[in-house]
Amino acid sequence: MEGEMKCPIEEIREKPEMRKAQQTYEVQVEVEDTPDTTFSWRKLWAFTGPGFLMSIAYLDPGNIESDLQAGAISYFKLIWVLLVAHIMGLLLQRLAARLGVVSGKHMAEIAFSYYPKIPRLVLWMLVESAIVGSDMQEVIGTAISFYLLSNGVIPLWAGVLITICDTFTFLFLEKYGVRKFEAFFCFLITCMAITFGYEFGVSAPDAGKMFSGMFVPWCNGCDNNMVMQGVAIIGAVIMPHNFYLHSALVKSRRVDRRRAEKVTEANKYFFIESAFALFVSFIINTLVISVFAQGMYGKTNQDIRDTCYNNTHNGMPDFYKVEFPANNDAAQSDIYHAGIFLGCTFGIFALYVWAVGILAAGQSSTMTGTYAGQFAMEGFIQIKLPQWKRILITRSLAILPTLAVVIFSGGIDNISSLNDFLNCLQLIQLPFALIPVLTFVSDRNIMHEYKLASVSKVVSIVISLIILFINFYFLYSWIGSTFGYNAVSIPITIFCAIFYIIFIAYLTYYCLVAMEFISPIQTKWLAEPIYHDFDAPWLEDSENPSTKNTISDDELSMRY
């Protein structure tokens, strides 16, 4: 009957374009359509932007804290670990960018068509929790920077609330265009380079030991604390939500996917840009490690307390001078105490410079976190919210628990230590980004001739296994040292571990099928991906995507 309403499943089945990805960016950056040469600076400039936004995750307050702790605990010995982490991160981020360019969709959109409904929703909730955890780190870093800049006039709880307003303000810049928005991020990265570079200059670290720690892959005389710190560096650098983010950011460039040479060209320039962006990130992180390796390694709380009192010309307010307790424990090394150490040693201006750097790190990463959450919601559950609503949701989820810690913890020391738990949360979530990205880029029905080659597949699998093994080791050690193994913690840990391992195994099944290591099993809960949601317009004689597989109403009902 005319005007009769159809059930959602029937409508989706008749209109597969409803499942096509919505335009992520209303206005895309044009790329000059000229014959590709070996290399073009003009084209590299056109593709420059997404890689720098991606690199923000390598410079967030959680990473900065991990860096300064690495320097304070292990001297210059772990800089090579930072270098290896950046190289592994680059190779994995390349996969995410390649996926976005070739498929025309970002990871969350692909997951919508790839996994059945319930597993997909579980994956979405896990990704969202990783984003909220990362966002909490940015909130903490920003609140501490306001506290330091105001010499305690702006309390922590007020600094936490300010992050709501400033995020709205900065994201408003997007209305002026993608390029201006990206330029603002580059400005914040420049602020970090200048501020942390200033601290490097005044502390004058030993360059020989710094380069030795960078290129000699060993840790002579390292104890368990140093090994754990090396593990923490890798966990802090490779962030789960960053793969989802990067695969979406590359869609800001208008790539003519009807022409294979343009797809190849985009992949090349995005990789070059990402490599340069992560090189800048590595330099900035190295500056931070070196400053605190030179200044805090081997120092006790009493040593730095004495420095604060004996340096009468540092201009530090008296309340800062008692922040380091009068004991012979290893000096406290977190974002807050690091700023006080710099102020006591080099003058209060060094403290302000440090706070500005942390503020830039917090502001830039909190905006990319909001972006990542927006892409995840639009892709996984096909809901597109106005950006102000998305900010309000993300900020609330991050701010409410952070405010609770600030109000009830009784001091800034406890809010800084919350970063350790949040880094652990990121480690738990990492498999839920690594396994899907490996799955999608290995699937010939999505990537076609751009799927992972055999050598790249082996390298990616090895890197992923190394990262996952390191993370599991860190988690096991962290749970043991934090909660201990007793009659209460053991059953809870086992219960959570069972669910965790089962879901990882579920995702791994799809990965092995995509890599063609095993044949698919046709069951309700291991349904085949909906391949007619994907296209390959550069293939002139390709099979009509809509005929790749036929989907029953039962399968559709599981997915939507």
Swiss-Prot record:
Tissues expressing the protein: Expressed in dopaminergic neurons (at protein level). Expressed in intestine with a weaker expression in the most proximal and distal regions. Weakly expressed in the hyp1-6, hyp7 and hyp8-12 hypodermis and in head and tail neurons.
Q: What is the topology of this protein in the membrane according to its UniProt annotation?
A: Multi-pass membrane protein
Q: What happens in the null mutant?
A: Increased survival rate and reduced body levels of iron in response to increasing Mn(2+) levels. Reduced survival rate in response to high Mn(2+) levels or to infection mediated by pathogenic bacterium S.aureus. Reduced CEP neuron death and higher Al(3+) accumulation in the body in response to high Al(3+) levels. Reduced ferritin ftn-1 mRNA levels and Mn(2+) and iron body levels. Increased sfm-1, sfm-2 and sfm-3 mRNA levels.
Which stretches of this protein does UniProt put in the Extracellular compartment? 65-71, 142-152, 204-229, 290-339, 412-420, 480-486
A cellular component annotation (GO) from this entry:
apical plasma membrane
Transmembrane stretches in the record are: 44-64, 72-92, 121-141, 153-173, 183-203, 230-250, 269-289, 340-360, 391-411, 421-441, 459-479, 487-507
Topological domains, Cytoplasmic: 1-43, 93-120, 174-182, 251-268, 361-390, 442-458, 508-560
Q: Which domain of life is it from?
A: Eukaryota
Q: What is its main location?
A: membrane
Descriptive protein name: NRAMP-like transporter smf-3
Q: Which organism is it from?
A: Caenorhabditis elegans
Originating gene: smf-3
